[in-house]
Each structure stands twice: as structure tokens, then as C-alpha cells.
């Protein structure tokens, strides 16, 4: 089981029926196929259980997990430039004239087509967890762009997907700043030793702290000077550690050994049973963490 490392959280903005059986059919039309000789990139769905299953969805207790795979061809620009330059020089020498821009552009396309079949591929996978009980979709992505790209593939596969980023009533950075300034955190949360502070004015600078006592006078001075806490490392109930950002994303999730060892008694050889047990454990913990965080940050914005 792949334990999520990041969470971008989205709210289903209206009632929508997401049944795993129906979704299985819809995703299969967009299942992953490798790049052909002239493809720069391809994206599609693969089984979240890897080689252990052909199913594109996996559901337990109203929680669905799916996985998108992307293949990208790697063509370093110096290589393209070198090939293109050689071609331009050869043609200009043969024709005794300088090539026009349109001719050079056309040559660049030719160079790309000739290089593509020989290019190496880079693969990445992005997991999505759909919580049909709480009407949330979580993407294991460190950037909003990667999350949005994966949701766009899901939207295309399902026909529609009414989701919006989870938004809170109060600006997150104001709440985080108040926690550090007052040295008081909501029940269940403890401050760790890492943060980012930004000046309200764009040219006012950024401070990134690691292994730092965030309740120290040094940090208090920055807050007094008008800097806001935009990232904060937190511990939740000694079970999950994370870095919370002012955009609502949770990064560098780390589950405690005690938590991860809860399913150690399950035979490692029984992949499906262990996958289910770990998925149930992870989603129940993260659902509780998200609920606690929303409350601690002042509640969800009412649209």
C-alpha cells in the first residue's frame, strides 16, 4: 500500500453519485497506454494495486482509490538545439543562403520527430482518494497543477466532476500566525520546529526556519514586524506529522511507526488483505485529521 505523502483536498460542490462499478467502466475508456513513437506524453488510469489487480478502482467502506500514470518523453533542449543547428548549417551550406524563420521552425519539427522514437521516458503516478462518505476528493500531489491535471483526467473520464478546492472561513495564514504568536494550539495539535514566514508586502522577504524553536523571541519579533506564518510543521496526536500551507495543502505526511505497525500481523504475502487493511487505516486516520484541521482552522467557508 502506498501511504500518501501529500494531500490536496477538494470538496464535491454538489451531490454526485460516484459508484465504483460505474466508475470502473468510465475509467477503462481512458486506461493508460504507453507513448507511441511520435507521442510526447500520455496519461491514463492504471490499477491502484499495481500488478496485483486489473481493476482501475478499489473500494472499501465508501472510500475509493484510483491511480493515474503519466509517461513523458525526455528530450533535453541542448540535444534538440545541437541537432537543429547541424541541420540548418548543412542546408544553408548546400543552398548558399540563410534559412527563413518559418523554414527553421519546420526543421525543428523534423528534428523532434526524428528524436522522439529514441527518447527516454519518465513515468510518474498520482493517487486519488475519493471519500464518498464526506464528499471529499484527496489527491496525493505536492503541486496544485499536478492535482488539477489529474482531476481534469477524472472529469474527462466521468463526463463531469463538480469539485472546488476546500476553502475555509478564515485565511489560513492568519490562524497559523495566531497559533505561533499566542503559543496556543488547538487540542490534538503540537508545534514542530519548521515554518515559513512571509511579509505581507511582496518585496518584504521570506524566512524559512528548520530546527527552530518557533515560540522563541526571534520568531515573535518577525511576527510583530508584520510577517505571517504561511507554512507550519505540525504533529497531530503523535500519529501523523505534516507541513500545513496557507493554500490548505498538507505536505510531507509522515505516519508514526505505531500507526503503520498496526497491520504487521497480516501476512505480507496476502497483498490484497494487507492493501485493504492499510487503506482503511490510512483513510480513517486522514479523514479524522482533515475533520480536526477544518475545525481548528475556523471551519469551512459556507458558499
Swiss-Prot record:
Molecular function via GO: double-stranded DNA binding
A family per Pfam: RdgC
Keyword Cytoplasm listed: yes
Cellular component terms (Gene Ontology): bacterial nucleoid; cytoplasm
UniProt xrefs under InterPro entries: RdgC (IPR007476)
Keyword Cytoplasm applies: yes
Signal peptide annotation: none
UniProt GO BP: DNA recombination; regulation of DNA recombination
Location(s), subcellular: Cytoplasm, Nucleoid
Main location: cytoplasm
Highest taxon of the lineage: Bacteria
Entry's family note: Belongs to the RdgC family.
NCBIfam families to which the protein is assigned, alphabetical: PRK00321.1-1, PRK00321.1-3, PRK00321.1-5
Function in brief: May be involved in recombination.
Protein name: Recombination-associated protein RdgC
Organism: Yersinia enterocolitica serotype O:8 / biotype 1B (strain NCTC 13174 / 8081)
Gene from which the chain derives: rdgC
Amino acid at each position: 500500500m502506498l501511504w500518501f505523502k501529500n494531500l490536496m483536498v477538494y470538496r464535491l460542490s454538489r451531490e454526485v453519485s460516484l459508484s465504483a462499478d460505474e466508475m470502473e467502466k468510465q475509467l477503462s475508456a481512458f486506461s493508460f497506454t504507453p507513448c507511441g513513437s511520435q507521442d510526447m506524453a500520455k496519461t491514463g488510469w492504471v490499477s491502484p494495486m499495481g500488478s496485483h489487480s486489473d481493476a482501475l478502482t478499489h473500494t472499501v467502506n465508501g472510500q475509493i482509490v484510483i491511480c493515474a500514470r503519466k509517461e513523458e518523453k525526455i528530450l533535453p533542449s541542448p540535444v534538440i538545439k545541437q541537432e537543429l543547428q547541424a541541420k540548418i548549417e548543412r542546408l544553408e551550406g548546400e543552398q548558399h543562403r540563410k534559412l527563413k524563420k518559418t523554414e527553421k521552425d519546420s526543421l525543428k519539427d523534423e528534428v523532434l520527430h526524428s528524436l522522439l522514437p529514441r527518447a527516454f521516458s519518465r513515468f510518474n503516478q498520482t493517487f486519488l482518494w475519493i471519500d464518498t462518505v464526506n464528499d471529499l476528493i484527496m489527491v496525493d500531489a505536492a503541486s496544485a497543477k499536478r492535482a488539477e491535471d489529474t482531476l481534469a483526467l477524472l472529469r474527462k473520464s466521468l463526463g463531469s466532476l463538480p469539485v472546488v478546492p476546500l476553502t475555509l472561513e478564515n485565511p489560513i495564514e492568519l490562524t497559523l500566525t495566531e497559533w505561533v504568536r499566542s503559543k496556543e494550539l488547538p487540542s490534538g495539535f503540537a508545534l514542530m520546529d519548521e515554518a515559513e514566514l512571509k511579509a505581507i508586502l511582496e518585496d518584504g522577504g521570506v524566512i524559512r526556519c528548520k530546527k527552530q524553536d518557533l515560540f522563541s523571541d526571534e520568531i515573535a519579533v518577525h511576527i510583530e514586524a508584520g510577517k505571517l506564518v504561511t507554512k507550519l510543521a505540525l504533529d497531530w496526536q503523535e500519529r501523523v506529522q505534516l507541513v500545513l500551507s496557507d493554500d490548505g495543502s498538507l505536505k510531507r505526511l509522515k505516519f508514526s511507526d505505531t500507526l503503520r505497525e498496526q497491520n504487521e500481523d497480516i501476512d505480507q504475502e496476502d497483498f490484497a488483505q494487507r492493501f485493504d487493511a492499510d487503506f482503511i487505516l490510512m483513510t480513517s486516520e486522514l479523514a479524522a485529521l482533515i475533520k480536526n484541521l477544518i475545525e481548528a482552522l475556523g471551519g469551512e467557508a459556507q458558499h
